[in-house]
Amino acid sequence: MRLRNIPGSREYIAQNDYVVHDPEQKKGKWHEVFGNNNPIHIEIGMGKGQFITSLAMQNPNINYIGIEKYSSVLLRAIEKREEYEGDNLYFLRFDAESITDIFAPSEVDRIYLNFSDPWPKDRHSKRRLTSSEFLARYDQFLVKDGYVAFKTDNRDLFDFSLEQVTLSGWQLRDVTFDLHHSEYVEGNIMTEYEERFSSMGNPIHRLVAFREKE
């Protein structure tokens, strides 16, 4: 999908107080950013921010970090953020390839991946956010009981993700191939993509992956 560039988006983001501009310097210190020791949940590839902003509004005692690498998309998330007066949500313009540079061991409690880029070509499989390579990264900074929650309408990507989770030695739970007609739909917050795809009749797939640590 080609993203439309919005003139001035980078400059606006660079001056916005809801965006952390030096995330590498916050590694191991995110609780200082929020000013408390509440759990930290992150969304990688948050898009226009509807999902994570809704979560932050519903859960003021949880800290949220939304990560998006495209400036024009992040700008839309900031617009939503500016309508929310809470102090438990920050954004990063950052490429998840280097995510271990910004989070220390046991610093994150939960990771959300929603409608991630499927990178359909086999040679790009390592770029998929549910690949074994990315799972190994997440394992470095998730707490002992932390987990990854993943949603997609792409069946090929979902099948790949199920396989990668198992091959990586992680465990699966709450797996469904049709979220909106399953027991797991209660409390589900939809993303912009999810609203569109489900309205077209596309089933939404969901899994939770966790690693049993000693």
From Swiss-Prot:
Pathway note: tRNA modification; N(7)-methylguanine-tRNA biosynthesis
Top-level division of the source organism's lineage: Bacteria
Catalyzed reactions per annotation: guanosine(46) in tRNA + S-adenosyl-L-methionine = N(7)-methylguanosine(46) in tRNA + S-adenosyl-L-homocysteine
UniProt-recorded Gene Ontology molecular function terms: tRNA (guanine(46)-N7)-methyltransferase activity
Annotated S-adenosyl-L-methionine binding sites: 43, 68, 95, 117
PROSITE patterns for this protein: SAM_MT_TRMB (PS51625)
Function: Catalyzes the formation of N(7)-methylguanine at position 46 (m7G46) in tRNA.
Entry similarity comment: Belongs to the class I-like SAM-binding methyltransferase superfamily. TrmB family.
Protein name per UniProt: tRNA (guanine-N(7)-)-methyltransferase
Organism (species): Lachnoclostridium phytofermentans (strain ATCC 700394 / DSM 18823 / ISDg)
Gene: trmB
